[in-house]
Amino acid sequence: MNDVDATDTFVGQGKFRGAISTSPSHIMQTCGFIQQMFPVEMSPGIESEDDPNYDVNMDIQSFNIFDGVHETEAEASVALCAEARVGINKAGFVILKTFTPGAEGFAFACMDSKTCEHVVIKAGQRQGTATEATVLRALTHPSVVQLKGTFTYNKMTCLILPRYRTDLYCYLAAKRNLPICDILAIQRSVLRALQYLHNNSIIHRDIKSENIFINHPGDVCVGDFGAACFPVDINANRYYGWAGTIATNSPELLARDPYGPAVDIWSAGIVLFEMATGQNSLFERDGLDGNCDSERQIKLIIRRSGTHPNEFPINPTSNLRRQYIGLAKRSSRKPGSRPLWTNLYELPIDLEYLICKMLSFDARHRPSAEVLLNHSVFQTLPDPYPNPMEVGD
């Protein structure tokens, strides 16, 4: 399967899970389509070959991302995209493809005109782009996307990043039923990335399949650090602001409670569920794009899990406890038992156990990435994990 096939798969389904920036004033956010799009074949998205007939304005209009927005704002965004393209060309890169605009700016598949190396360049004026550059400069780990370099053009910050074959969102669409060993290999890479980040006082805050990049199950990395929070005290929960994606956010983050690295564990649990079942987010509202409000999302989690009152945070000042515990009083499920949603899926017992632990309603009961990696299911995997097949074959 080629690059376009994977993208078309998800555009056709109309599944859009928008990330929420900590500064919700960007034009993309007012339009409801706010995806970070930096590796090849990011999903869901559109792409266009960089040829003499390519028209950024027509590209954006055809995707209707500016419906209901004043025309001058659309024109301003088109102008910024054009400015980014000029800056990239002046920096010595040939633009091969233009990806769908994201919350923080624009992304392009490029080739270094001197070395012929294929890369992805993210260009943006917003804080998230600068935040990502700051975070990535300090990180070196095989499961974390590596920053190759940065440059500026006028007021734009541009990140030079490696180009991966696809993201996990598209990969799951192409593969459908992954072997358990591949699922565990991918999840191991994600958990290793989280262990590394948390040990370095960083919370990602937007772990989801769209932000996990893959060449094959043994070559996987976590990227898109525009929502990252740092430095944090990994031993004490605090409220660092609201960010991420509603469909994959943890209950405490949705409730605006103090939080810590456990928010990433919840989101990684959603990713594991998606790999194990081939379904979109367990707590994504049917018929919607995931951009519903936080209150409805929390209610959905409680209802589908059958959350028991004893599974709520014990802190009496917790927003989650104060505002939502009443919804759980009719639950007949025993606290600590299998959540109700497990009755809908036939999951291998080890995968179900991991998912349930990672999706513990009370963040105190979610294992750390280090603890999860010590589970026996990961110990039997080859390390490094071999490439069983080419992505898209």
From Swiss-Prot:
EC number: 2.7.11.1
TM stretches of this protein: none
GO MF terms, alphabetically ordered: ATP binding; protein serine kinase activity; protein serine/threonine kinase activity
Primary localization class, coarse: host cell
Domain Protein kinase: 93-378
Catalytic site positions: D206
Matching Pfam families: Pkinase
Record's keyword terms, sorted: ATP-binding, Host cytoplasm, Host nucleus, Host-virus interaction, Inhibition of host adaptive immune response by virus, Inhibition of host MHC class I molecule presentation by virus, Kinase, Modulation of host cell apoptosis by virus, Modulation of host chromatin by virus, Nucleotide-binding, Serine/threonine-protein kinase, Transferase, Viral immunoevasion
Cell compartments where the protein resides: Host cytoplasm; Host nucleus
Family classification: Belongs to the protein kinase superfamily. Ser/Thr protein kinase family.
Protein name in the entry: Serine/threonine-protein kinase US3 homolog
Annotated organism of origin: Varicella-zoster virus (strain Dumas)
